[in-house]
């Protein structure tokens, strides 16, 4: 399977695109990111074009598509897109060892969907942006078809705002 245009746009909307290499606050020393979350062989100060960012994204997604297609060949397009987003953000190795995968392989798609929300932490703390992304991935996974991406984003922005208002 291949990620759909809607799935790719979904990932890109959460990742954002930076055409100059940067070091994220949670990144290990010496790790730089460029484009749509690309971290391979990126040098401090490196710059790329939008076309190069799009190519890096396609190259980064391809091995995820291949591994997921082999691992779970009988998922719908929206389920596949949600899984690609999950793996793109967390890494295929996190998915391979996850309860989400075990439940999906056992045919428990509702149980698998519930597992998305357990992957919202960075450095031991719940991150609102990760909550929004996992909630959106779960919603995508459970859909029988794509709702307009803008509608999904607005819904989860509102949910995120409500969550922020209730944080101590």
Label each region the model flagged.
Residues 83:
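Noncatalytic nucleic-acid binding interfaces
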């Amino acid at each position: 399977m291949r990620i759909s245009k809607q799935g790719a746009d979904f990932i890109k909307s959460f990742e954002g695109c930076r055409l100059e290499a940067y070091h994220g606050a949670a990144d290990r020393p010496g790790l730089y990111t460029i484009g749509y979350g690309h971290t391979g062989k990126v040098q401090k100060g490196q710059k790329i074009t939008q076309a190069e960012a799009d190519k890096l994204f396609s190259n980064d997604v391809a091995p995820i598509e291949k591994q997921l297609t082999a691992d779970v060949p009988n998922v719908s397009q929206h389920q596949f897109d949600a899984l690609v987003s999950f793996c793109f953000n967390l890494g295929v190795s996190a998915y391979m060892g996850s309860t989400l995968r075990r439940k999906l392989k056992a045919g428990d798609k509702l149980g698998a969907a519930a597992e998305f929300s357990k992957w919202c932490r960075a450095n031991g703390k719940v991150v609102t942006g990760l909550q929004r992304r996992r909630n959106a991935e779960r919603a995508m996974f459970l859909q029988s078809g794509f709702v307009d991406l803008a509608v999904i984003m607005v819904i989860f922005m509102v949910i995120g705002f409500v969550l922020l208002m209730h944080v101590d």
